Amino acid sequence: MKFLDKYKKTKNIRFNSFEETLNISLKRKFKTIVETGTSRGKTKFFFIKRYNWKDGMSTPMFAEYAKFVNGKLHTCDISSKNIKNAKKFTKNFSTYIEFYIQDSLTFLAGFNEPIDLLYLDSLDGHDPIAASNHQLKEAQIAIEKLHDKSLILLDDKGSKTNLSINFFIKNNFKIIYETNHQILLSK
């Protein structure tokens, strides 16, 4: 997957876990990705939108992977501004993405397809208690849509992941890859 090379930047501190996740996804022939919390980008000089590498750039990477495998990325964010920015960054892959402006809990409850790869990254981790509780609720809703080979990638290790990790482990998932920022689980 040579397309990943362009995302390997010094500031993309999450690249290694995304690369590992997508390589496993390819081996497992995954086509359906669900992402809560879309890549925001950032504004420079009030009008120029550009990548925010510290965000990890999940949405463009997942979108390009979806194109590569003829799959679909379903990404939701409560902010219409974030969705608008993500649409600009991913315009070359628009056929392979569905955007949802919705709270992640509502979105996940209404999502009725099996999920191959679940990426939980909604709600900023500045308030670890609220973020952890929210991610746990996402996990509790999404688990029914996962299958035996599904992957779960949790972002903001140590803040948002505090409760969801234990929930997934109690439901027979195991940590298969871990960095300072993210945790990848599978059965």
Across the structure, where does each feature detected by a protein language model lie?
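A short alpha-helical cap/connector motif
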Residues: 1-187
